[in-house]
Regions:
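Short aromatic/hydrophobic "clamp" motif used to bind/position activated sugar donors
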Residues: 93
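Short, well-formed alpha-helical segments that are part of the catalytic scaffolds
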Residues: 15-30
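Conserved donor NDP-sugar-binding/catalytic core segment of glycosyltransferases
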Residues: 105-163
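Glycine-rich, basic loop-to-helix element that forms the pyrophosphate-binding segment
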Residues: 71-88
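Acidic donor-binding segment of Leloir-type glycosyltransferases
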Residues: 26-71
Length: 493
């Protein structure tokens, strides 16, 4: 391996004690021949004496940079990290938060991993990130005598303690730590411990500084790394420990995260960013895998598409109409619609090319940017019956907001074919588990499905026409018109 320089960028704000411990562990790195490191600390206006602590470390590192920036209304993690990026001179950039500890071989492992594959981005396994010492049991960490040489072993033990492990652990194991197998590897990005090749960082650009407060800036950064063809890897050997500290301003952080999630969707306006607004948790990939594989026209056959097309004649009147859930250009053309939402990328490409006079967007329809009452009619097909009921509710509510009338066009005479459950060879016994409900009661079921890179996927729901119509009657002030496969020309409220 040729010489490699690894730059650590550490943003900090009033965490002098945590920063000191983190720098102590970095100072204990045992560097192999040809590996060098620099440490860049960016102080975002601390008032707790951080500068005095940092001055003590200038002589402990061969390359050390400390920059202080006065706090103002635009202070944020993104701006602080971007300032660090401009100061860094390494071939590899490692982003660490204050109080994140790494073992003595961390730098060597990072250098070796990225030498193997220059486009690789490392998501470092991290323990303790969600632990709050004011609420959680700290005895698992208190029992440990933590040192730079035993940190990986400590992380391994702590990861076995409920609440202490990395929440990405399950999806990483399911994909043999190759997160590029996922539909949305960027959704798991956390810059509290992430390594990026400097050249790839330059291609992707720095952090989006419109993300003020807390949340989403690292996910958006990882999204652009994904667009720059990064290969994402969950790194276990070069692991990290987040020293637990009190979670301050919880409500403020929650509001900030919600605002930043909305900004993320405004910036991209695609199905994944839309799902982040509608579904809390790290299971976006399970839902996206289903949406990417879904082709209602193929599943239900030619007769289904004919029934849909016959229903289109009722709205081909030139009025502003939005279609949701039609993935065939020929079928969609029968509606004369002005707008159409495509729920997966493959359909989006076909529909956009096949309908040049129609405005096609890559969206589910649960969180759109249309004004209230923008459409004369929104037509929703059997597609809504395949979604989890919580997402179906979101689609109906949004349709009621943006349209003067909503039509449920149900042309499927039977339920769709279920994917055959074929567990991987290593699985001797198939057990279906349902994770604990999220805060809003949303829960997901998973099943093993065949595929080279696919381990889990949200199952296919099939709500009856009556169930969806009942939801519409409850959620929409004027109800919805429903057309069924058995009686496709008779409309009923």
């Amino acid at each position: 391996m040729s010489s490699v320089k690894v730059s650590y960028i550490i943003p900090t704000y009033n965490f002098k004690d945590l920063l000191k411990t983190g720098l102590d562990f970095l100072a204990a790195q045992r560097l192999d021949a040809g590996v060098e490191m620099e440490v860049v600390v960016i102080d975002d206006g601390s008032s707790d004496g951080t500068h005095q602590i940092v001055n003590d470390y200038a002589e402990r590192f061969a390359h050390f940079v400390y920059v202080y920036r006065a706090r103002d209304e635009r202070s944020c993690r993104s701006r602080t990290r971007n300032l660090g990026i401009r100061q860094a001179s390494g071939d590899v950039v490692v982003f660490l938060d204050s109080g994140v500890l790494v073992g003595e071989q961390f730098t060597n492992i990072v250098a070796a991993r990225l030498a193997e594959l220059p486009s690789r981005v490392l998501y470092h396994r991290i323990a303790g990130l969600e632990v709050d010492p004011q609420q959680d049991d700290m005895s698992p960490l208190q029992r440990e005598r933590l040192t730079p040489d035993n940190l990986p072993a400590v992380v391994e033990r702590l990861s076995a303690v409920p609440g202490w492990g990395d929440e990405r652990e399950g999806v990483a194991r399911a994909n043999a730590d190759d997160l590029s197998r996922l539909v949305l590897p960027w959704a798991y990005g956390m810059t509290c411990a992430m390594s990026v090749p400097a050249e790839l960082l330059r291609q992707a650009g720095g952090f989006e500084e419109r993300f003020l407060g807390w949340g989403c800036e690292d996910v958006e950064f990882a999204l652009r790394l994904h667009q720059a063809k990064a290969v994402f890897h969950f790194e276990r050997e070069a692991c990290a420990l987040h020293l637990p500290h009190p979670k301050a301003h919880t409500k403020k952080h929650s509001r900030s995260h919600a605002d930043n999630a909305i900004l993320l969707h405004k910036l991209y306006g695609i199905v994944p960013t839309e799902l982040m607004l509608m579904y809390p948790g790290l299971f976006f990939d399970a839902i996206m895998l289903k949406l990417q594989s879904l082709q209602t026209g193929v599943w239900f056959g030619a007769a289904y598409k004919q029934r849909l097309a016959s229903g289109g004649a009722f709205w081909a009147d030139g009025a502003r109409t939005l279609l949701i859930g039609i993935d065939d250009p020929d079928c969609a053309r029968c509606f004369g619609a002005t707008h159409l939402l495509a729920y997966n990328e493959e359909s989006f490409g076909h529909l956009r090319n096949g309908l040049p006079d129609c405005s096609v967007s890559y969206s589910l329809g649960g969180r759109t940017f249309f004004a209230d009452g923008y459409f004369a009619t929104v037509v929703i097909t059997d597609f809504i019956r395949l979604l989890h009921p919580a997402l179906a509710v979101q689609l109906l509510r949004e349709a009621g907001r943006i349209a003067k009338s909503v039509v449920l066009l149900f042309a499927a005479a039977a339920s769709p074919p279920q994917p055959k459950v074929v567990p991987p060879a290593i699985v001797k016994r198939l057990i279906t588990l349902e994770p604990a409900p999220a805060e809003d009661g949303f829960s997901i079921e998973y099943a093993f499905v065949p595929g080279n890179h696919r381990a889990v996927m949200e199952r296919y729901y099939w709500s009856s026409a009556e169930e969806i119509a009942e939801l519409a009657a409850r959620l929409l002030p004027a109800g919805a018109w429903t057309l069924s496969a058995s009686d496709p020309v008779e409309a009923q409220v």
